[in-house]
Amino acid sequence: NAVMLGYNTDVEKDGGVALGADSVASVDKDIAGYDPSTKLASANTSAAWKATHAAVSVGNGSTATRQITGVAAGTNDTDAVNVAQLKAIAGGTGSIHFVSVKGGNASSVNYNNDGAKETGAIAIGANAEATANSAVAMGFNAQSNGSGSIVIGESSGLIPDASKRGASKGNSSIIIGTENVDKGGTKEHAGSNDGILGSNNTIQESNGAFVTGAFNHVSDSYQFGQLSASEQQKLAQAMADGKPLGKYIGKWGSHVFVTGDGNTVSQGMNVTISGSQNTVKNSKSQTVIGDSNKITDRNAGTVSGKQEERTKNVSDLVIGKGNDISGNDTYMKGYESLTVIGNNNKAVNPSSSIVIGDNQRLSAIEESVVIGSMTPEEKADPDIQQKHASVVVGYHAQSGTGAGGGMNVALGHGAKAYGWQETVTGIKSIVEAGDSGYDGYLASVYGGLNTVASNKADQNDGMANTVVGTLNKTEGANGALVFGAGNSVTHSFGTAPTDENGKSMDEYWSDAILVGQKYAMGEGPLGHDELRKAMGLAMSTGGGSVVTMGNGNTSDYAVHSQIIGSGNILTGTANTPSINNTINGYANTGRNVERMSMMGTGNNMSGSTADVVIGDYHHKDGGKNNVILGSMATEKKTVEKTYTMKDASGNVILEKKYKVTENVPIKSHTANISNAVMLGYNTDVEKDGGVA
């Protein structure tokens, strides 16, 4: 059945046709044609792809070849294609401009346009590979291994290990940029719904994370909760209605959003970062804006077990640079949030507070408001910390110490409240703390440069002191009330009664007063009336309870006494304090006196008991139960005095003599007189019981 037409022709297969001189027909029937889509012989067995008869040859393929001319364009699948048809195809591809792919060598993946492995997949670029349904990989070394995922960029990829790939891993993620990698992970939906835009970013064992920038890293931030039947029904209805789906997919994805450079998120959930070099680890519901902030273990385990409740209800907010927040309140209630705005603040196990400022050290802070800044040196001092349930406003202002304290108000530049439940309002005013938890307890200071000092020896030092004014001081005193400027109350403690067993009642009252800490937080067994009663009894008996009102008054070793005026002095001794005295006026002095009432100017009483003095310039030593009304004769004298200035260490740095003109009494009263009455100008009694 062969046809051989022409000189030196030959047919080597049955039914072959050789046309023209030197033609050889050597191709048999049943030979499949070349499929350009696969670059292999076609697997199609139809007559259009597989010949039913041996081939027709017009040459021998080497020394004899011929053009077939005058061929019209074919119509059917088995018709020949002419050059006109090929030109038309070339013209169609030539209409695409500015598209060029320059790859490596023939061994590169996708060299043979085979990088797209699954249905609907697209791979463009040398070594580009799309191995999942509808995946897109575009760029040199681009890898897209998740269904419906898009990877665009050099050496970027959604590339979970082949052994870990699954139907849900890496799905619907988008990566755009250079050398970005989403490694997926072992979890069912790891790598799904992620987004990366930038360069050198990494996501691993996470889902629902979105990263923009460079050199960011997100890991172990994964959530895929199951919807309830009701939620699934609502979601389906919302999808059918074309409504937003956000509120139905809160259980899906980590909701981690990172914008910036060099940020790290590990074990995060509902985390938003904007900035550079920030770190969030084992912490959920965090918003971080700024640079070099570090938040760790905000979701550490707790005794209360409410850390996940906190995640649902609130979010921490950190704005600034260099802030370091670690740990949480082990007894949290589930609604605590921390707001830090500033730079280089450090908080360990914080709860719910608001901090605005720089270089603050916060120790287990809870329900506090801190506005102001410390220096780096102050931050480095472990004794300078802000404590819980406090309001602190001002540069260098402080509530509590490293050893304890808290629940204070400190308002003003350098205001310090070191103890418990203190109120300090004023520039550089301070309530010191001692060795006892009672020191400075419930003290109140209003004004600048006041000090409620602790001598570190007396328990209850500074308790319930009230200071209003400026440059006043109390030390070794409790229950003191100071109003004015330049006043001093020192060594002022009372003696509380004892119970039937000889135990001081002050212990019972102090224990009750301390319950005020719980009362302030809405807890504890005692109400306000019981606390008030205990405080009243403690201060009226065991308290020093010295009241000074005016300027430049001094009380030392005096209790249960009152000074009103200016320049007055009331003193006693450690063994026998002056007690139950009243001084009203100017420049009066009482030394070692008891139950004395003095009103006037320039009086000086020493060692007297139950004397009443009304008038000016009475000087008397000893005696008791005297009544003096009137003024003594005086003369003006120039008196030389010395002003000595000392530094904080007690060293004399200045000493100046100066002179003043004063009224000086011409004579003093007879000493050690008792039961006398002196009525009128310049009177005196020389015998007990006398009346002048």
Task: Give the role of each language-model region.
Residues 52, 62-89:
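Extracellular repetitive beta-rich solenoid segments
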